[in-house]
Amino acid sequence: MQKLKQQVFEANMDLPRYGLVTFTWGNVSAIDRERGLVVIKPSGVAYETMKADDMVVVDMSGKVVEGAYRPSSDTATHLELYRRCPSLGGIVHTHSTHATAWAQAGLAIPALGTTHADYFFGDIPCTRGLSEEEVQGEYELNTGKVIIETLGNAEPLHTPGIVVYQHGPFAWGKDAHDAVHNAVVMEEVAKMAWIARGINPQLNHIDSFLMNKHFMRKHGPNAYYGQK
């Protein structure tokens, strides 16, 4: 697990490097599917002092199997997403400014241009609000459940992120570094959408044919973006 702990540590350290977190407002995890184990950031540990050995290993029930610290308070959310979405290898949660602003406004981040379409096939959805019962009960687990509910039948890697109403963004990918990459993109397109709608409040969504072209040339069966 040492290699995965190092990867998760590096991915967590990318969050302040890319300006996605303030203080300890974020966490990254990754899963070893063969072993059924998840590595996640410890709860409340400052990035300035954190080390790879501080990463916490939990099983799929959330039981700590390795590590001196308590795991992130959002662990149950991560675990629910891993259980329900077999294609996910890494998950990120932040309170990055612009994506969180859309979450607090209760609005999906609209697909307005090709930067968005290169990564997200359509709007980045916003979940419904959790009920008082859901919050007072198993809050973090129910956060994961409302994310799954909002995704519906969508392929998670075609919509590699979501904003949770009144909370903030979650992003994911094939591994921890891919998840962070998608979290960075989500924050950037959230900022772009906010600026663009400020310039033109009547701005329409990107044309569907342009959306399809940009997403499929990177992620479709006949993708040709980048090097093989």
From Swiss-Prot:
<comment type="pathway">
    <text>Cofactor degradation; L-ascorbate degradation; D-xylulose 5-phosphate from L-ascorbate: step 4/4.</text>
</comment>
<keyword id="KW-0413">Isomerase</keyword>
<feature type="binding site">
    <location>
        <begin position="43"/>
        <end position="44"/>
    </location>
    <ligand>
        <name>substrate</name>
    </ligand>
</feature>
<feature type="binding site">
    <location>
        <position position="74"/>
    </location>
    <ligand>
        <name>Zn(2+)</name>
    </ligand>
</feature>
<comment type="similarity">
    <text>Belongs to the aldolase class II family. AraD/FucA subfamily.</text>
</comment>
<dbReference type="GO" id="GO:0008742">
    <property type="term" value="F:L-ribulose-phosphate 4-epimerase activity"/>
</dbReference>
<feature type="binding site">
    <location>
        <begin position="26"/>
        <end position="27"/>
    </location>
    <ligand>
        <name>substrate</name>
    </ligand>
</feature>
<protein>
    <recommendedName>
        <fullName>L-ribulose-5-phosphate 4-epimerase UlaF</fullName>
        <ecNumber>5.1.3.4</ecNumber>
    </recommendedName>
</protein>
<dbReference type="GO" id="GO:0019854">
    <property type="term" value="P:L-ascorbic acid catabolic process"/>
</dbReference>
<keyword id="KW-0479">Metal-binding</keyword>
<dbReference type="InterPro" id="IPR036409">
    <property type="entry name" value="Aldolase_II/adducin_N_sf"/>
</dbReference>
<feature type="binding site">
    <location>
        <position position="95"/>
    </location>
    <ligand>
        <name>Zn(2+)</name>
    </ligand>
</feature>
<feature type="active site" description="Proton donor/acceptor">
    <location>
        <position position="118"/>
    </location>
</feature>
<feature type="binding site">
    <location>
        <begin position="72"/>
        <end position="73"/>
    </location>
    <ligand>
        <name>substrate</name>
    </ligand>
</feature>
<dbReference type="GO" id="GO:0005829">
    <property type="term" value="C:cytosol"/>
</dbReference>
<dbReference type="Pfam" id="PF00596">
    <property type="entry name" value="Aldolase_II"/>
</dbReference>
<feature type="binding site">
    <location>
        <position position="167"/>
    </location>
    <ligand>
        <name>Zn(2+)</name>
    </ligand>
</feature>
<feature type="active site" description="Proton donor/acceptor">
    <location>
        <position position="225"/>
    </location>
</feature>
<keyword id="KW-0862">Zinc</keyword>
<dbReference type="InterPro" id="IPR050197">
    <property type="entry name" value="Aldolase_class_II_sugar_metab"/>
</dbReference>
<dbReference type="GO" id="GO:0008270">
    <property type="term" value="F:zinc ion binding"/>
</dbReference>
<keyword id="KW-0119">Carbohydrate metabolism</keyword>
<feature type="binding site">
    <location>
        <position position="93"/>
    </location>
    <ligand>
        <name>Zn(2+)</name>
    </ligand>
</feature>
<dbReference type="InterPro" id="IPR001303">
    <property type="entry name" value="Aldolase_II/adducin_N"/>
</dbReference>
<comment type="function">
    <text>Catalyzes the isomerization of L-ribulose 5-phosphate to D-xylulose 5-phosphate. Is involved in the anaerobic L-ascorbate utilization.</text>
</comment>
<dbReference type="GO" id="GO:0016832">
    <property type="term" value="F:aldehyde-lyase activity"/>
</dbReference>
<dbReference type="InterPro" id="IPR023499">
    <property type="entry name" value="UlaF"/>
</dbReference>
<dbReference type="GO" id="GO:0019323">
    <property type="term" value="P:pentose catabolic process"/>
</dbReference>
